[in-house]
Design a protein with these regions (language model features):
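Conserved helicase ATPase core of P-loop NTP-dependent helicases/translocases
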Residues: 46, 56-70, 177, 188-219
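Conserved strand-helix element at the start of the C-terminal RecA-like helicase core
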Residues: 29-44, 120-123, 160-185, 189-193
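Conserved two-lobed SF2 helicase motor
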Residues: 69-88, 208-227
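Conserved segment of the helicase C-terminal RecA-like domain
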Residues: 116-130, 210-215, 228-295
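Conserved interdomain hinge at the start of the Helicase C-terminal
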Residues: 20-25, 102, 106, 112-113, ...
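Post-DEXD/H (motif II) to motif III coupling segment of the RecA-like Helicase ATP-binding lobe
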Residues: 31, 96-151
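Inter-Walker segment of RecA-like/P-loop motor cores
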Residues: 42, 48-86
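Long, largely alpha-helical accessory region at the distal end of helicase-like NTP-driven motors
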Residues: 285-312
Length: 312
């Protein structure tokens, strides 16, 4: 491991980790941040180009590539981070994704191999603290406390949910069905899914953020740091298909999504709706207190070995 300075900024949702990373990056002459979602990379890109000259900022995702000739700052999905850049600052968001079955090997590769010349910053959940401290004993840990309170609201029918609510579903069919029900009962809802085109997805986010509609129906994509002005998050289901099988969400995943309710000093609430089974009192206490089981396993593929095999 390199001896360049590494800082891990860890804590639950709504703790300002991403904001800190952006401001820290811009304090250096050059930098890059890898995000878990295309939509989040685009959101941060739009914010940064309002602060500094657009010709200094690049956006690189699987869908969009805006790379000015003299770009100094690179905002990317983790998979799209260019590995040949020598930059002062490198950040990786939602670093606990190293434990994800599907994408974890990419995050772990960035954890092991991507370094800023002056500072590397890892942002994410406290659940990964112990395992990454074993990888490098010189990492500086910064703990961030949530700025607002998160409480359980129990079960509510969709017809009785309040405005500034996101309803979470785990299939396109369910997302569209719930959105149609809200349109009939409440007047309108925006939709956010990873499968939407960038233009459509950005337009749907703006539809909600501008106040044109009061409700959002989304997949668990919003759990990965997308900053929406939400007071409530309701789950229509606590099971998802993970690419291999239908499984229950673990408490950390529920907490990550539920934690999108409440912004800055405004408290948030989470609950369930429809046929979703009740969350136990014990689990509610753990989610409200952001107390989740620590990560014990990371996924990794030796990228150097893979490249060697491909060259043979």
């Amino acid at each position: 491991m390199t001896k360049h300075k590494i800082t891990a900024v860890l804590g639950p949702t709504n703790t300002g980790k991403t904001h800190l990373a952006i401001e820290t990056m811009l304090s250096f002459d050059s930098g890059m941040i890898g995000f878990p979602l295309r939509l989040l990379a685009r959101e941060v890109y739009d914010k940064v180009i309002k602060k500094i000259s657009v010709d200094k900022v690049a956006l690189i995702t699987g869908e969009e590539k805006i790379i000015p000739t003299n770009a100094k700052y690179f905002l990317c999905t983790v998979e799209s981070m260019p590995i040949d850049k020598h930059l002062d600052f490198v950040g990786v968001d939602e670093i606990q994704m190293c434990a994800d079955h599907e994408r974890g090997h990419i995050f772990t590769d960035r954890l092991l191999n991507m370094r800023g010349e002056k500072l590397t910053m890892l942002m994410g959940s406290n659940t990964i603290k112990n395992i990454i401290s074993k990888l490098d004993g010189d990492i500086e840990f910064i703990n961030r406390e949530r700025l607002s309170k998160l409480t359980y609201a129990g079960h509510k029918k969709i017809s009785r949910i309040n405005r500034k609510t996101a309803i979470i579903a785990f299939s396109a069919e369910e997302v569209y069905a719930i959105a149609e029900l809200i349109r009939r009962q409440k007047g309108g809802a925006a939709i956010v899914m990873g499968s939407l085109s960038p233009k459509t997805r950005n337009a749907q986010v703006e539809l909600y953020q501008s106040g044109d509609v009061d409700f959002l129906v989304a997949t668990d994509a919003i759990g990965m740091g997308i900053n929406m002005d939400l007071d409530y998050v309701f789950f229509s289901n606590l099971k998802k298909f993970d690419g291999k099988k239908l499984r229950k969400l673990n408490l950390s995943e529920i907490g990550q999504i539920a934690g999108r309710a409440g912004r800055y000093l405004n408290d948030g609430s989470f609950g369930i709706t429809g046929d979703c089974k009740e969350i136990t009192a014990e689990d509610v206490e753990l989610i409200e207190g952001h107390k989740f089981e620590e990560i014990r396993t990371l996924f990794w593929r030796n990228s150097n070995l893979i490249l060697t095999i491909l060259k043979v």
